[in-house]
Regions:
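Histidine/acidic residue-rich metal-binding segments in metalloenzymes
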Residues: 3, 9-81, 88-109, 120-134, ...
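An acidic- and aromatic-residue-enriched active-site/binding cleft used to recognize and process polar
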Residues: 40, 84-85, 112, 175-176, ...
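Mobile "lid/hinge" segments at catalytic clefts and subdomain interfaces of large enzymes
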Residues: 1-4, 188
């Protein structure tokens, strides 16, 4: 599990992160600002401590199991059920509501990261609402999880419902509500999309110069991305991908080394991975990961 044990680990290796986080969190609370974060795999006393530090509206978008979802909802955590292109946690989390019949007012639908192609072909929030309904949630309740629930969590009392005195952008759904086929979109009272066609010009975004020169990095050599080793048959700590999850497995693998470096093992899907800082850091984190199943090439 994470939590206190993770804090100790980070403190041992990079104590300024913990120190700065505590100082900034205390300052934010002192001036009336919200403090929030994630709470993956937290239960019992550790979850309670996280909530006390975060305040009454603390949230988590890293919940991955029904057990976690049940406890967080019972503790009053706003649970953002993630269902994006690569992280798919909603079907497991929603069981806390469909099977345990818990109150859904603190359940929120979220996509986190979505590929542009997925948004174009499947939709965005309308797609996750559609999937939630297929998991057994009433259509009106599923829509609340994407509208009034997040508005309430963020303190945006003027948003989230169609009612006098409220602000609302409107998505018109055609046919069965459960299908979530959006036919028209109104933005600030103006019809901006109809039948999947944009009705107003959308100029290309102009990036400011400051973001065009933000990478501060010395040239990286191939050996900088490799794991040094003085043994010929080392035992190597590896990362294991979990399908549709952000969390990963950790395991030890017998590997081979030559010329002072551990060799990748493509046949067994043990591929090199590196974390290269872009803000002036000199250190590089290098290791091995299993699960990509790539036989050639690379990506960044």
């Amino acid at each position: 599990t994470q939590g206190v044990s993770a804090i100790r680990f980070v403190y041992e290796h990079n104590y300024p992160v913990i120190r700065d986080t505590i100082v900034s969190s205390v300052y934010a609370r002192s001036i009336g600002k919200e403090v929030d974060g994630n709470a993956p795999e937290l239960f019992g006393n550790e979850l309670a401590a996280h909530i006390i530090c975060g305040g009454p509206d603390v949230s988590c978008h890293e919940t991955t199991t029904k057990k976690e979802a049940v406890e967080k909802l019972r503790y009053g955590v706003y649970m953002l059920m993630r269902e994006g292109s690569t992280q798919r946690n909603m079907p497991e989390c929603i069981r806390a509501i469909t099977e345990e019949v818990l109150d859904s007012r603190r359940a929120i639908l979220a996509t986190d990261d979505m590929l542009a192609g997925d948004i174009a072909t499947k939709g965005h929030m309308n797609d996750i609402i559609r999937r939630t309904i297929k998991e057994g949630v009433d259509p009106a309740e599923a829509i609340q999880m994407a509208t009034i629930n997040p508005a309430t969590w963020l303190g945006l009392s003027e948003l989230g419902v169609l009612a006098p005195g409220k602000l609302a952008d409107i998505a018109v759904v055609e046919g069965e509500l459960a299908d979530m086929n959006v036919s028209e979109v109104f933005l600030s009272g103006q019809l901006v999309a109809k039948d999947r066609q944009l009705l107003l010009p959308l100029p290309a975004y102009q990036y400011p110069d400051i973001v065009k020169h933000s990478v501060k990095r010395k040239p990286v050599k191939p050996e900088d991305l490799m794991v040094k080793c003085d043994k010929s048959n080392p035992k190597v700590n590896c990362i294991g991908l979990i399908l549709d999850q952000n969390l990963t497995d950790a395991f030890v693998e017998d590997m081979k080394a030559e010329d002072g470096y551990v060799k990748p093992d493509i046949e067994n899907d043990l591929l090199p991975i590196a974390n290269v800082g872009r803000h002036g850091q000199s250190d590089i984190g290098a290791g091995f990961v299993k699960g990509f199943k790539m036989k050639q090439g690379a990506f960044a």
